[in-house]
């Protein structure tokens, strides 16, 4: 897409991948096709997106790994149809709307979960 903000030398991309315009991809991200990332998304450092579809204005947090997922708004759907509401599951600090202007500070429980998963936390900001 047009006006994609990415340092392609510091991002791992393989297979057919579409990236929509105005999307920001941070260094260290990995994108494996077939994958489609809609316009105005923000893919944070170390995120892995594999065989997935990410709809417009999605923010994928640092270290998040998505395999065969469909992300739209506050919902995430797996290949088998399992789905969950990111806000209700208190995971909107990992995957959220890229247009959010507020900062979301992870709770102590979220920090502990991230430590167990080996995921580095960043504040959710657009």
Predicted features by range, described:
Residues 1-126:
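Left-handed beta-helix
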């Amino acid at each position: 897409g047009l006006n994609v903000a990415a340092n392609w030398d510091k991002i791992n991309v393989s297979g057919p991948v579409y990236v929509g315009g105005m999307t920001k991809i941070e260094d260290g991200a990995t994108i494996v096709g077939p994958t489609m990332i809609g316009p105005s998304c923000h893919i944070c450092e170390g995120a892995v997106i594999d065989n997935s579809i990410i709809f417009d204005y999605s923010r994928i947090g640092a270290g998040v790994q998505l395999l065969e997922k469909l992300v739209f708004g506050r919902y995430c759907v797996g290949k088998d149809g399992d789905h969950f509401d990111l806000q209700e599951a208190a995971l909107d600090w990992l995957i959220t709307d890229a247009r959010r202007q507020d900062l979301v500070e992870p709770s102590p429980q979220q920090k502990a979960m991230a430590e167990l998963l080996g995921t580095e936390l960043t504040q959710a900001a657009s």
